[in-house]
Amino acid sequence: MKRYAHAWLVAVLVLTTPMVVAEAQEPTRRGTVELGQNYPNPFNPATTIPFRLSDQLFQSGRRPVVSLRIYNVLAQLVAIPNLQQSGQPLDNVELDCLNPQGGFCEFSAYWDGHWQRSTREAASGVYVYQLIVNGQRTSRRMLVTK
């Protein structure tokens, strides 16, 4: 009986201890790509994910191929957010930069908090969003709360 009482005490401590999420608000930079922190974070039920691409990626009429994916902690694909400017899923999309500012073109994606092609809502927890630009990957974490 003592063994179970000890396990119960540990479970109570783990479940009742508040979780603090500390995340740098500076964008993750990878040369020509900046992936910003989603906002709000933590969120429920939806969030916006900002990112910036250097105008160098668009020189001479080039169009970078961009994907944005959201994974759970088991590395399962949860969703592909939509580009806010067009509503198009960000899955191998060639982007245009019509109005660069300060050497960068700004974009944002929207995730409604649902699993891809489903009405099932994402559970509370940590998720990783990964931006892929011409094969270059940049990732950040976000938190869903219910």
Can you annotate each of these PLM segments?
Residues 87-134:
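Short, surface-exposed loop/turn motifs with a glycine/proline- and acidic-biased composition
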Residues 2-30, 80, 89:
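Short, compositionally biased serine/threonine- and acidic-rich segments at solvent-exposed termini, linkers
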Residues 22-26, 35-36, 120, 124-146:
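C-terminal tail/sorting-segment detector
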Residues 83-90, 146:
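A short acidic/small-residue loop/turn micro-motif
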Residues 67-71, 76-77:
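Beta-strand signatures of extracellular beta-sandwich domains
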Residues 53-55, 113, 133, 144:
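Hydrophobic beta-strand positions in extracellular immunoglobulin-like domains
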Residues 25-39, 43-69, 83:
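Glycine-centered coil/turn sites that cap beta-strands in beta-rich domains
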Residues 38-41, 51, 75, 111, ...:
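Terminal processing/anchoring signals of secreted or surface-associated proteins
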